[in-house]
A protein has these predicted regions:
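Divalent metal-dependent catalytic cores for phosphoryl transfer on phosphate-bearing substrates
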Residues: 60-177
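N-terminal pre-Walker A segment at the start of P-loop NTPase domains
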Residues: 189-226
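Glycine-rich phosphate-binding loop used to anchor ATP phosphates in small-molecule kinases
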Residues: 277-324, 330
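ATP-dependent NMP and nucleoside kinases share a basic, alpha-helical "lid"
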Residues: 264-268, 306-347, 358
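Glycine-rich phosphate-binding P-loop
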Residues: 230-250
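Conserved GTP-binding G-domain of TRAFAC-class P-loop NTPases and closely related GTPase folds
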Residues: 252, 332-376
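Acidic/His-rich, divalent-metal-binding segments that scaffold phosphate/diphosphate chemistry
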Residues: 1-87
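Conserved substrate/cofactor phosphate-moiety recognition/catalytic segment
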Residues: 243-298, 335-338
């Protein structure tokens, strides 16, 4: 489904389409909220109030792509709450811990067939919609703002969503005037560091430092030495076309692949997976070969799914001390159904959908260059 599919020709949200395609939406009115922050009652009531606030900002008969993203972000910002809401005996009220991450996964599933650039802006806004509540009270507000300035959606979009979220809440903890002042101060801070509406300029060590810890020696090399070689990190679901991209663009580069290593050590079958012990051995061999390539300053490509930020961080931890140029290549099939069809005899539909659910789009702090390729 595309984001435009949830809007009528007159620029209004088509709630019949939403309810028929997003089952979680039908659970919002049955999901309670903490009374101190949400006197409006259930999540559905709050969501409708936030949508009304956003409609005041961007609504109209003719909606731009920007308008549709912002209205969709307002509509789905709390879509993860039904699965995350629990009663806390300690707090004596309901909590919805990590609902922003659950919401991101739901939105990506629903709009997977949307253009990646549009879809990932929406996913980013849902995942980060809580961030502005905590910036000023954090240990390093400037660092947080610099990081957010480089996100998939800019700080203006994020603060607009957060302000609508605040205005759409009946809160005993923050008045509308206090919300407005908080957002104004964050905007001023973003402007002062050059990150209001555009990404902050960063050194390589600062950028990668948002993803992983770096030694002083690694920071020195990242900022003052020419990389001289490249590590490509492939990212994509099974069947997305990673092998095809490699053959067409970097066929001469040394390829490191878990599938190939599994074959080497005798794990047999169609798209086989070994025991835990065997898979640990596959990881050891791959990492050993990756480090060897880095020591020799040899271009290489890590050709696995690498859909989680955790796995990509493990790779970065190994390679950054050697100062390579890091290129992430994200390859996507036109639709999720295409992924399933291309690998139907090798990877089950259930596995692909599970991997899609755990997919995390690469962030700016994970690469020097991001290449996005959608297979036809």
């Amino acid at each position: 489904m595309k984001i435009r599919d949830i809007f009528t020709p007159g620029g209004k949200i088509d709630f019949d389409v939403v309810r028929n395609n997003v089952p979680e939406f039908n659970m919002l009115e049955h999901t309670p909220q903490p009374k101190d922050w949400h006197g409006e009652g259930n999540v559905y009531n709050h969501t409708m109030m936030v949508v009304d606030e956003m409609d005041k900002l961007v609504g109209g008969y003719t909606l731009t792509a920007y308008d549709m993203i912002m209205l969709a972000a307002a509509l789905f910002h709390d879509i993860g709450k039904p699965s995350c809401t629990k009663f806390s005996e300690e707090k004596g009220d309901f909590t919805s811990r990590n609902h922003q991450y659950a919401g991101e996964r739901i939105v990506r599933r629903v709009f997977y067939d949307e253009d990646w650039y549009v879809r990932e802006k929406l996913c980013y806004l849902v995942r980060k919609h809580m961030a502005p509540y905590y910036i000023l009270g954090g240990s390093d507000p400037e660092r947080e703002v610099r990081m957010l300035s480089c996100g998939r959606a800019n700080i203006i979009m994020l603060l607009s969503l957060n302000l609508c979220d605040s205005f759409g809440s009946i809160s005993a903890n923050e008045s509308a005037a206090e919300s407005e002042e908080r957002v104004r101060r964050i905007a001023e801070l973003a402007d002062s560091v050059g990150g209001y509406g555009s990404p902050c300029v960063m050194s390589r060590s600062e950028k990668f430092g948002y993803c992983t810890e770096l030694s002083d020696d690694a920071k020195e090399r990242l900022d003052n030495e020419d990389p001289g070689f490249t590590v490509y990190i492939m990212v994509g679901l099974p069947g997305s076309g990673k092998d095809t991209w490699i053959k067409a663009n970097i066929p001469e580069v040394t390829m490191l692949s878990r599938d190939n290593i599994r074959t080497e050590i005798g794990i047999e079958g169609e798209k086989p997976f070994g025991t835990e012990e065997q898979e640990n051995e596959v990881t050891r061999i791959l990492n050993e070969r990756l480090v060897e390539c880095c020591k020799n300053r040899q271009d290489c490509v890590v050709n696995n799914t690498n859909v989680s930020k955790k796995r990509r961080k493990e790779i970065l931890d190994l390679i950054l001390p050697y100062n390579p140029r890091v290129v992430i290549v994200y390859v996507e099939a036109p639709t999720l159904a295409d992924n399933v069809e291309r690998r139907k005899n090798q990877v089950s539909k259930k596995v692909i959908r599970r991997m899609c659910n755990s997919f995390e789009f690469p962030e700016f702090s994970e690469y020097d260059t991001l290449i996005v390729h959608q297979q036809q």
